[in-house]
Swiss-Prot record:
A GO BP entry: regulation of DNA-templated transcription
Name the record gives this protein: Cold shock-like protein CspD
InterPro entries the UniProt entry points to: Cold_shock_CspA (IPR012156), CSD (IPR011129), CSD_CS (IPR019844), CSP_DNA-bd (IPR002059), CspD (IPR012751), Lin-28_RNA-binding (IPR051373), NA-bd_OB-fold (IPR012340)
Gene Ontology, cellular component aspect: cytosol
Source species: Haemophilus influenzae (strain ATCC 51907 / DSM 11121 / KW20 / Rd)
A GO MF term: DNA binding
Keyword Cytoplasm: yes
Amino acid sequence: MEIGIVKWFNNAKGFGFISAEGVDADIFAHYSVIEMDGYRSLKAGQKVQFEVLHSDKGSHATKIIPIADTQE
């Protein structure tokens, strides 16, 4: 599993991109692979854990799990 930060996520379209250390290109993120209860969405700057699949269309995230901010 990789750890990354959400660069941006469009709730209306249901997708966005994640950046991760050691990965040159941004990683595509789709709402359908976000693992959480309720409305599945991400916010820019949010820390997430995920797996990466590589295809001819680029890298995309699977099994995206938001990481709770424990600094509150």
